[in-house]
């Protein structure tokens, strides 16, 4: 039950990441923001979190603060709830969305450590927790269209409901240990610290690969709806279908990738995912119809998330003594890097076209594919790498 509650909060937390992207077309249509301006809102959701995420990871490693996931969830919800209310002021929107981004950043390290504690560290079990996030992102566009369609941008206030309701459920289920200190990095079940060194070089290469993933994810989330509107002159409601399909396909990719990683090897899955994602991005750029955009977006979501769980577990194997920091970088900092690039992508979209943005994304994914060949597998049983302590039967426990 604890893992189900935690997974539900992951869905709620990442719902607010999806809500940012879903709100962008309405800021363009109702508040007359430029593409560069809405890309700046994406930056707001990620800029401060790019600094805060490793700090939250360090705090999780050092102090095991379980309550930080709940506090982060509530902050994420509050920021998005306020964003539509203050839409007349770009600075105010930027500020409240930044608060939401910090909340999302605070959630991930603590929640990932708890999920690992509950369900172990295999790619398969990790993928299940990650799917909670995919589900939340997928539900966000429909929820945003519903509340904004009925009440205008001020209807964003209703978007705080998932954080309050699911946060309350989690607090009740986890009340006995919510404010207790988690065992940092679960070293009790591992080998002595001296025998499990951190491999910072490998982790740096993984971070470089993830940076290309981040730009692809944020770029697609920011521009896929706007692309359909610009190229095919469809309404915001129809355009949002692709935005829902993207994370829904990502959920399929996450589960499939986790299963394949445990059977075929993580690096094979990582490389296959980047290659598929690059091809799908080119298909989006040259799609002849809105339906073709949706189909290509589904392929992109699947390919982009095939490596997701593998990348998380690789980060844990590279930094076995700093699980919180590894999670913070894998799930947060790399995503934030995409947000930092988003204003540049928005400027390109204003000056050229959104099609140009997707061609750039395709090139970056090919760069990620090439960089993935530098990565090394750290297999359980190595004298330097402890086997993750996993309870494989717990399939429901456990991002981006």
Indicate residue ranges for each PLM-predicted region.
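Helix-loop-helix hairpin linking two adjacent transmembrane segments in secondary transporters
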Residues: 129-176
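Primarily marks hydrophobic transmembrane alpha-helices of the MFS/SLC 12-helix fold
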Residues: 66-69, 270
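C-terminal transmembrane helical hairpin of 12-TM major facilitator-type secondary transporters
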Residues: 261-311
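Extracytoplasmic gate region of multi-pass secondary transporters
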Residues: 20-21, 202-251
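Residue-level signature of mid-helix packing/kink "hotspots" within the transmembrane helices
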Residues: 18, 46-54, 138, 247-255, ...
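Cytoplasmic helix-loop-helix junction between adjacent transmembrane helices
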Residues: 96-132
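Helix-to-loop junctions at the C-terminal end of transmembrane segments
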Residues: 52-64, 253-265, 349-350
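C-terminal ends and interior cores of transmembrane alpha-helices
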Residues: 74-88, 276-288
């Amino acid at each position: 039950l604890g893992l189900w509650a935690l997974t539900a909060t992951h869905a709620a937390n990442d719902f607010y990441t999806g809500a940012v992207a879903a709100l962008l077309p309405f800021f363009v249509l109702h508040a007359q923001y430029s593409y560069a301006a809405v890309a700046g809102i994406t930056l707001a959701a990620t800029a401060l979190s790019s600094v805060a995420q490793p700090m939250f990871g360090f705090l999780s490693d050092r102090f095991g603060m379980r309550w930080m996931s709940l506090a982060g969830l509530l902050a994420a919800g509050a920021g998005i709830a306020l964003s539509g209310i203050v839409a007349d002021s770009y600075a105010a929107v930027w500020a409240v969305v930044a608060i939401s981004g910090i909340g999302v950043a605070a959630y991930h390290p603590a929640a990932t450590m708890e999920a690992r504690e509950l369900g172990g560290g295999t790619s398969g079990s990790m993928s299940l927790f990650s799917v909670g996030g995919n589900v939340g992102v997928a539900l966000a566009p429909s929820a945003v269209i519903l509340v904004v369609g009925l009440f205008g941008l001020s209807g964003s206030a209703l978007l705080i409901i998932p954080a309050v309701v699911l946060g309350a459920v989690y607090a009740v289920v986890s009340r006995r240990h919510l404010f207790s200190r988690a065992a940092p990095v679960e070293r009790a079940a591992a080998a002595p610290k001296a025998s499990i060194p951190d491999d910072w070089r490998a982790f740096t290469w993984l971070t470089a690969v993830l940076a290309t993933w981040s730009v692809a994810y944020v770029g697609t989330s920011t521009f896929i709806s706007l692309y359909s509107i610009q190229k095919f002159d469809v309404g915001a409601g129809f355009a949002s279908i692709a935005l829902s399909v993207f994370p829904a396909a990502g959920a399929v990719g996450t589960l499939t990738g986790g299963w394949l990683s445990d059977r075929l090897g993580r690096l094979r899955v990582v490389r296959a995912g980047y290659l598929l994602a690059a091809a799908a991005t080119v298909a989006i750029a040259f799609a002849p119809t809105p339906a073709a955009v949706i189909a290509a977006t589904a392929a992109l979501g699947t390919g982009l998330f095939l490596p997701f769980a593998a990348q998380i577990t690789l980060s844990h194997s590279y930094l076995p003594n700093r699980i919180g920091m590894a999670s913070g970088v894998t799930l947060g900092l790399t995503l934030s890097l995409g947000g930092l690039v988003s204003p540049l992508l928005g400027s390109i979209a204003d000056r050229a076209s959104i099609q140009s943005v997707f061609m750039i994304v395709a090139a970056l994914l090919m760069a990620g594919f090439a960089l993935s060949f530098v990565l090394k597998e750290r297999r359980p049983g190595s004298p330097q790498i402890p086997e993750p302590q996993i309870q494989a039967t717990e399939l429901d426990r456990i991002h981006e």
